[in-house]
Amino acid sequence: MSGSYTPSPGGPFSALTASMWPQDILAKYTQKEQTVEQPEFRYDEFGFRVDKEDGAEPNSSKLLGIPLTEDPQQRLRWQAHLEFTHNHDVGDLTWDKIDVTLPHSDKLRSLVLAGIPHSMRPQLWMRLSGALQKKQNSEMTYKDIGRNSSNDDTLAAKQIEKDLLRTMPSNACFSNLQSVGVPRLRRVLRGLAWLFPDIGYCQGTGMVAACLLLFLEEEDAFWMMATIVEDLVPVSYFNTTLVGVQTDQRVLRHLIVQYLPRLDKLLQEHDIELSLITLHWFLTAFASVVHIKLLLRIWDFFFYQGSLVLFQTTLGMLKMKEEELIQSENSASIFNTLSDIPSQIEEADVLLREAMLISGTLTEVMIEAQRRKHLAYLIADQGQLLNSTAAVANLSKIMRRQSQRRKSAITTLLFGDDNFEALKSKNIKQTALVADLREAILQVARHFQYTDPKNCSIDLTPDYTMESHQRDHENYVSCSQSRRRRAKALLDFERHDDDELGFRKNDIITIISQKDEHCWVGELNGLRGWFPAKFVDILDERSKEYSVAGDDSVTEGITDLIRGTLSPSIKSIFEHGLKKPSLLGGPCHPWLFIEEAASREVERDFDSVYSRLVLCKTYRLDEDGKVLTPEELLYRGVQSVNVSHDAAHAQMDVKLRSLISIGLNEQVLHLWLEVLCSSLPTVEKWYQPWSFLRSPGWVQIKCELRVLSKFAFSLSPDWELPVKREDKEKKPLKEGVQDMLVKHHLFSWDIDG
């Protein structure tokens, strides 16, 4: 009987692919029409049961009241575009003559935003998403996958069986076990669970697959699902941890702060966890929350643009309801309004227009940068890095079941064997590197506590919470409440008169007055007096309090700990997964990566109308009163080391150790690591996918390094450089102040400042 009954245009089931027409129900419709009786149930063009007539009442839904129609002009525009871009052959243009992928262009984007003609959706969705190319390039056919996944005894198969009738119970194609769509949905979901064993079965995929089966043939629907899992959404979106979609909820929250600040303030005031509502929107790509007509328009753009559309659509929805949310009286009202937003959106054009207005400038690069950061934070927050470093490798790529075709010996020799055991050994190496770094940090911390007892109260436990990362920049911005300006004595100065301030080498003097260029007034041990300015060195205490334990000119042991223990452990982490040079040779050192990443990060501000030191970036001030971001500080540090060390022909190892010393002095070593790891193009260029810097593991290293920011270092970046000849020939310091001493006897000194 298949194909015997055809739905009437615009009538029930008319929008479905032909093979999904439920012949038993269509047969009843035909019989009812002949007997002039009302059918038992009414169905819309998508096969969903309609309980009552809709469209006549003033408050009726536009989506239900207006049938799905195809705009002839829009179809002509699509045909013209396809003919113009694929007019390689003379004659009628058919789908087999159109490329498997459609090159992105402004024209194509505008066409997609305006909507794809419904009759063209199956072919265009496959091409826009890349599913057709995936289908044609696959080593295994859908039949092979179906044959391998037909086992009823697997855990995934049993879970799928439980959910088959729960997925879309109000649709005639999935309402009972005899419905035409149920066996198709079973095979598609089993095939996905078999092809992606790391994911298995996720309930979120069921709703998406069922919607696709309404409009695409079974095999095409399967490859569309494979494309969504592998290409359109991030890794781990559908696995048991849902860490991918959880990460996107944090990214969404970040975007709301940027694009909808009033709504952000409202959510914070009422302590509403938005992800409780929106996670399901993302997991099902809106399939479970919006009307099918609206879903088709969202999916048109989703298959063209990818997961970026999920963010833009959500922001558009929230913007449309922002005023209503702000006027809500309490938390319960806000939560309910947020939950009801998707079901209240009725006009796709209005939604997409609002989405483009508020977030049209949002790009995939911006989203990926935030994803990388928040994924690392999320995993560190959950403690997974401490317990299972193997989980990190699984987040970099979805493992697809492959056909059993072995690599040749030459291929293995040239490109290596990235099997599970190899990844496992790399994860073991990661654990050892973290342990070495942690021990080096503890050695430095114990040195501070032993040498300078005031450090004994410092907590040495790393803080892995999400809040700790938010506080990092706040701590960086805020300077010490103590506004004292202090200096360290470079040599002994004996007191002869009552108005002189005597001190010994390395004493810490509080400066009272610097009015005179040569003679300053200071205080030490309750006594005030003048002293030669050249006899002291101003301490950098913008955000720290000087400690003798961290001064390499006073305490020799700190040099060995920093340059001999800590720096090598940090270098080992930067060397982990560093890509080796080609067979032709070439340098391969973390310093080269740091140089390039620092330059790339700071270049983003070069084209600004203002200087890259503009005050709108309210970070710490340097000695010239300019404002420096962590990126700028890193860039300056790298340039400073290059200038001083290149003149001495120093090796890159020495440069790296000196830069680490600068980072410790400025208490920004952990922030510099974040800057470097956030430079995605540079990291991907220099490091393997399994490396520490390309995995979420870097955030644990950041948390470990943050412990060092609790201590005050005064390290010389030039410690390993040879002493310059002019420095050797310089006159003793005391000889340089004879004129100043004469000046002391000629003038009176205002000791009280």
From Swiss-Prot:
CDD domains: RUN_SGSM3 (cd17688), SH3_SGSM3 (cd11813). Residues 557-720 form the RUN domain. InterPro entries: Rab-GAP-TBC_dom, Rab-GAP_TBC_sf, Rab_GAP_TBC_domain, Run_dom, Run_dom_sf, SGSM3_SH3, SH3-like_dom_sf, SH3_domain. SUPFAM superfamilies: RUN domain-like, SH3-domain, Ypt/Rab-GAP domain of gyp1p. Pfam families: RabGAP-TBC, RUN, SH3_1. Belongs to the small G protein signaling modulator family. This is Small G protein signaling modulator 3 homolog. The lineage of its organism: Eukaryota, Metazoa, Chordata, Craniata, Vertebrata. The gene is sgsm3.
